[in-house]
């Protein structure tokens, strides 16, 4: 398990160094790290996955020219760690724990004094002839896509994911990657939002309208990247996945007996 964790940590470092987009309101970059989290979640139990993301984040932060510099006081690993942990829970059939984690994180975002449910009021007035342009929030809440992900999380789509990853065909595997990558990346996004609001305060309040407009496209790019990268990797590792999950099941059975 140590060797596997080290290997997947190294794998996580690679996309963590690559730029997806610039952050809004502060210096720094959003990286492509989310395109590989389904692989970590499938192979690693939550604790190992969190450890791998932590180490991978720290390594990437100190690689010259890396996009994965530390922007949130060293807590930058939290979003990716929760992403991997949630996927790991879902793959192992622990949907209740995954749902609690997701709902609790949404709650922490909502109660933060530097976040807003509807963000359109902070959108600046534009010059003529663009003064009519507005952010549609209200009526659309900032967390609209996160709520869609919550609906997917509690739906039948997250049942029997272990079988999809272990025995499903290419199409079924790609669908499973889509499901876990979407839910995981939305949890990672809201976790990043909590860090952003907590550390940058008024800057975050001014920035939410712009984040609202951009984040669906960024998340879509990460989910698409995860499908393209993780599906062939997991398909090629099908026998290894089955062996690891069988060993985990035997270990859990031994502990309960």
Question: What are the roles of these predicted feature ranges?
Answer:
Residues 1-257:
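Loop-helix junctions at membrane interfaces
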